[in-house]
């Protein structure tokens, strides 16, 4: 039997800013709202939406508040991932219900039956200069990955 197909859409590097600040003369919030409207209109059969980092441009709570507002009306499952511009603590304040692993990392797995998606948190602690923060996988995160892979048949 052929594997069942799933429609998964990934939005990456949305770089939300505070108060309509622009990046390269573009407003990331307007662009995200347009993308969400497009998804709602053209991809009603969406099974899962994934946002890979950078969710925010400066890791500010206000930037995650925009993300929360824009995504709050979506009925599809959503997975968020951190990037080097993100701040886990600021994200947590706006999304306190979001799943964190036992070590406080924002990583998860989704089992679609025929395949599994693994989402790793590579944000380097502590949050610092974003230009120098290229990501990191510590032993705890690698152990989590190894455990997830061991669960796969």
Language-model-detected regions and their locations in the chain:
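Extended active-site neighborhood of metal-dependent phosphoesterases/phosphodiesterases
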Residues: 61-152
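N-terminal active-site segment of His-dependent metallophosphoesterases
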Residues: 1-65
């Amino acid at each position: 039997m052929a594997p069942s197909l799933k429609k998964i859409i990934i939005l990456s590097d949305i770089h939300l800013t505070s108060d309509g600040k622009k990046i390269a003369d573009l407003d990331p919030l307007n662009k995200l709202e347009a993308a969400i409207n497009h998804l709602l209109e053209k991809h009603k059969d969406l099974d899962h939406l994934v946002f890979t980092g950078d969710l925010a441009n400066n890791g500010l709570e206000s930037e995650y508040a925009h993300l929360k507002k824009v995504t709050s009306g979506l009925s599809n499952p959503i997975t968020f991932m951190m990037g080097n511009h993100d701040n886990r603590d600021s994200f947590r304040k706006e999304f306190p219900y979001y799943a964190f692993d036992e070590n406080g990392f924002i990583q998860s797995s989704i089992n679609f039956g025929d395949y599994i998606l693994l989402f790793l948190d590579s944000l380097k602690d502590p949050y610092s200069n974003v230009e120098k923060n290229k990501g990191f996988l510590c032993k705890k995160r690698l152990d989590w990955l190894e455990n997830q892979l061991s669960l796969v048949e």
